[in-house]
Structures are given as C-alpha cells and as structure tokens.
Amino acid sequence: MIKSLKFSHKILLAAALVVIATFSLFTLYNDSLQRASIREDLEDYLHEMGEITASNVQNWLSGRILLIENLAQTLARDHSPETTQALLEQPLLGSTFLFTYLGQTDGTYTARPTSDLPADYDPRRRPWYNAATSAGQTTLTEPYMEPAIHELVLTIASPARQGGQPFGVVGGDLSLQTVVKIINSLDFGGMGYAFLVSGDGKILVHPDKDQVMKSLSDVYPRNTPKIGSGFSEAELHGNTRILSFSPVKGLSGLDWYIGISVDKDKAYAMLTKLRTSAIVAALIAVVAIVLLLGMLIRVLMQPLTDMGRAMQDIAQGEGDLTKRLKVTSNDEFGALAISFNRFVERIHESIREVAGTARQLHDVAQLVVNASNSSMANSDEQSNRTNSVAAAINELGAAAQEIARNAADASHHASDANHQAEDGKQVVEQTIRAMNELSEKISASCANIEALNSRTVNIGQILEVIKGISEQTNLLALNAAIEAARAGEAGRGFAVVADEVRNLAHRAQESAQQIQKMIEELQIGAQEAVSTMTESQRYSLESVEIANRAGERLSSVTGRIAEIDGMNQSVATATEEQTAVVDSLNMDITEINTLNQEGVENLQATLRACGELETQAGRLRQLVDSFKI
C-alpha cells in the first residue's frame, strides 16, 4: 500500500507521523507532570484538611474535658449534697452533656438529669469510674451506641480529690453529634468525605451510618488501608479510593484519627480534561501542519511534476527522441533534467544504429528461410526410401524370430520332458531305497518281537515263583492264626495280623494269575505280528524288483529326450544368430531413419526459428520506425 503512494504523499505521511509522535511524547510528558502536580496538591490539601479537622475535634473535646475537670475541682472544695445538686444542674452542663454525675467512694451516685436506675446500681463498678481511678487523671471512654437516643455517646470521667485523697469520680456523657457535624461539614467538591476512626481500625463516625462501628477490613476487604502517615489506595464498590489519616492529638486515653476518602477518578478528573484538551489540540495541530506541508510540497514539487509530464510525453507519445527537457534551475531538479537529456541523446543514437541493423537482419532471415525449404524437400525423399528398406528388413526379422521361437518352444518342451523323466527316475530310486529300508526295519521288528516273546517266558517263570511264595505265605498265615486261636485272649492281636497277611498273600496270588494271563495273550499277539511282518517283507522285496525295472525304462527315455533336446537347441542357436544379424541390420536402418527424422525436425525448427526471426525483425523495424530519429 505504501509503495503505491505518491512521493509527495509519502513525505506528508512521514511528516504527519513525526508530528504525531512529537505531540504524543509531549502529551505523555505533560500528563506525567500534571499527574505528579495534582497528586502533590491533593496530598497537601488532604493533609491540611485532616489536620484542621483533627484540631477542631480536639478543641471541641478539650473544652468539654475542662468543664468536667473544673466541676471536679469545685466539688473537691464542697461536695455536700446541696452543692453537688446545684453544680450538676448548671445550664451550661445541661446544654453540653446528656448526663452529668458524681460517683463517690461510698457508692453514692448523683446525676442530673435524673433517671431510673436499678436498686443495686453501684458507680464504683462502672468502667468510667474504674478507668479514671486507675489512671488518676481525666479519661475518655470508647464511643458506644446509646439505645435510648440511638446516638454515639462518649463518657468523660475525672477523679475528684479532697486533701489529696480521692472521694469520687465526676463524669459526663457527651453526644458525638457535634463531632459528626464537624466531620460531615467538610466539603471536598463532591470528590469524597471524612470519617472518624479509632487506632484499632473501628469506624466511629461516617456519613454512611451502615459503616459505623465496622472495621476498616470489613469496609475495604481488599487492600485494607493502614492507619498512619502517608496515603494509600483501596477498592470500594469497584472504585479506587485515596485515603489519608490525621491523628487527633492531645486527648489522653484516646487514639483517634480523621480519615479522608477521595474518589481517585474524580480527583484526577482535571487531568482527564487536560489530557483530552491536549489530544484535541495535537490533532488540530497535526491537521494544520499537514495542510501547510501539503501546499508547500505541491509548490516545491512542481518542477518534478513538469519533468514527469515531459517523460510521459516521450514514453507514451510519438516516440520523438528529438525532444529535450528545459533546464530552468540549478538545483537537484535541474541536474536531473540535464542527466535525462543526456540519456535521451544516447538512446537516440542507439535507436538509429538499431534501425540499420534491423533491415540487414530481415534480409538475412529471408535467405535462411529459402535454403531451409530446399533442404526440407530433399530430407523428405530420403526419409521415404529409408522407410521402405526398414519395412522389408522388419518382415525378414519377423520370420526368423518365428522360427527361433518355435525351436525354442520345442527345446523347452523337450527339456521339460527330460526334467520330468529325471524326476521320475529319482522318485523310483527313492522308492527302492524306501522299500529296502522298510524291509530292513521289518526284519529288525521281527527280531525284537522274538526277543520280547522270549522275555515274556522268563516273566512267566518269575510269576510261578511268586505264586509258590504266595501259597507258602498263605499256609504260614493260616498256621499263625491257628496258634493265635489256641493262645486265646493273648494272641488276638497276632491273629488279626496273621489274617491280614493271609489276605495279602491271597491278593498277590490273584494278581500273579492275572499277569500270567496277560503274558500269554501278549505271546499270542507277538507270534501273529511276526507272521504278518514276514509276509510284508516278502511283498516289499517284490516291489523293489518292479521299481528297478521301471527305473531302467525311465533311464532309456531320458537318453532319447536328451538327444531331441540337443537337436532343438542347435536349430534354435542357428535361428537366433540369423535373428541377431537381422536385428542389427534393422537397428542400423532405424538409426539412419532416426537421424534423418532428427535432421528433418532440426530443419523444421530452423525454418520456424527463421520465420520467428523474420517476424521479430519486422517487429523490430516497426518499433524502430515508431521513434522519430
């Protein structure tokens, strides 16, 4: 997009960016200065207002404290009931305090105005009494909400002494409405408000009654401000507040602070207005400067504009190379005009030389085209005759290839038959070997079965011995049983053992008889197996003789097939040699034809190039003729 802009527009854009950057930096710098100045003024103002308000509160409370202390000193001289009542009923005390009272060490309590109190009311157990007695001086209690009037109340208590000995405590309940009025009377131009807070963060006086007696952490859960010197910021209902705290000095027993909360956005509203004014002024200045620069650049760029028009006339007009630019100044534009005139002069000379060369090139191109057409005719005749020879050789080669293919097929079939005969011969030989091995294994099996039969005879003899032992054991067990019966009760256990031995001998005799029966069946089966294997051995020997005769016949067939295969291979070899000669001749003819075709194509390409050259030469002449030289 920037590349498509005019040079004058680029200058304007660059100047506008410089001006905008300058004004932006100036605006930011001025904004920073104004912000610092406003913050400094705001801090001074808030500090001053806090100090003044704290002083007003301190003066107001100090006057009330003096009233209580003067009353205590007066009662110290005479605290008779009549004097006490008269002093407590003074109009000044009645208009200043809600209640004024005297609590004595003997438990006597006198108050004005009077109120209903419990019968067991003892002033000596009240916090204000104990605080003043313990401190030995005037004390102030923490503000508390009085249910009867729904107002914050503060108690001032001062010890009363007579002859250096305390005889009671003088107190006064003071409403904080005056303090509320003092604090609420502060006007911050709608930016904020003041409030009274104790040292532990409890809000005592606040324009919003819902915030009274709450802690700062409850009101400002996020970024809870710290009470002390300096300023802090905290979030309240989505707005940033600036807070400062000024201590109320000179009050014994009280740690109070005047807090001031200001809306930060409103406090810096003037800065926003100044920033907006600066931005508007900067925009107006940028527009004015751009307009002035535009008019100035248009005047300064006029020589360059005239030069551009002259160049456009030379480029898009009649191509008059005899025109020259007028030099009207000695600045950069004048030097550019002089250089352009020199350039056009050199182009003029070059175009004049190109015009003569273009005419010569056109004539030479015409001669080359004529020669190429003649060569094309001769090449066509040569190509036709070469194609005829190639066709005849191709037919001869096809016949030779057919013969070679048939001979090769015959040789292939003969080779297959020979291979199959060889395979059959090998199969017969393998069959003979298998028959011989089978016969040998049958003979070995017969021998093994005979050996097994002889061993079963030995087992039968062993069983006869076992049967004899069993019979003898049975007789011995029977004799033992008889002797045990004669022994009576003493031989009963031995009789049981003898009976068990006789049963075991009987079972051993039965098992020996079963084994004898199985051995006899095994001997019969072995004799039958020997007979069957002997007959199988005879049949296998006959099969071996038949297989030997088949192998001899296959050997004879294999020899005949090998002779036929040799003849076919000789024919195929001779035919392949003939085919190779024909192929070589065909390749030579084909190569000649290919070279001829390439020559024709080259001539055609040359002819086309010459035609294109002639066309370009004509175009060059037209272009050169378009210039006025």
From Swiss-Prot:
Residues 32-276 are periplasmic. This is Methyl-accepting chemotaxis protein PctB. Residues 298-352 form the HAMP domain. Its main location: membrane. Signal peptide: none annotated. It is a multi-pass membrane protein. L-glutamine binds at S115, Y121, R126, P127, W128, Y144, M145, E146, D173. L-arginine binds at Y109, S115, Y121, R126, P127, W128, E146, D173. It holds the Pfam family HAMP. Residues 410-424 have a biased composition (Basic and acidic residues). Keywords: Cell inner membrane, Cell membrane, Chemotaxis, Membrane, Methylation, Transducer, Transmembrane, Transmembrane helix. InterPro entries: dCache_1, HAMP_dom, MCPsignal_dom, Sensor-like_sf. It comes from the Bacteria. GO terms for molecular function: amino acid binding. Chemotactic-signal transducers respond to changes in the concentration of attractants and repellents in the environment, transduce a signal from the outside to the inside of the cell, and facilitate sensory adaptation through the variation of the level of methylation. Responds to L-Arg, L-Gln, L-Ala, L-Glu, L-Lys, L-Met and L-Tyr. Also involved in repellent responses to trichloroethylene (TCE), chloroform and methylthiocyanate. PctA has a broad ligand range and responds to most of the proteinogenic amino acids, whereas PctB and PctC have a much narrower range and show strong ligand preference for L-glutamine and gamma-aminobutyrate, respectively. These receptors are paralogs: pctA gene duplication in the common ancestor of the genus Pseudomonas led to pctC, whereas pctB originated through another, independent pctA duplication. Disruption phenotype: Mutant is defective in taxis toward L-Gln. Mutant also shows decreased chemotactic responses to TCE, chloroform and methylthiocyanate. The deletion mutant does not show significant reduction in swarming or immobilization near epithelial wounds, but the pctABC triple deletion mutant shows a significant reduction in chemotaxis and immobilization along wounds of human cystic fibrosis airway epithelial cells. Residues 405-424 are annotated as: Disordered. The keyword Lipoprotein does not apply. Residues 37-260 form the Cache domain. The ligand binding region binds directly to 5 L-amino acids. Belongs to the methyl-accepting chemotaxis (MCP) protein family. Monomer in the absence and presence of ligands. One of its GO terms (cellular component) is plasma membrane.
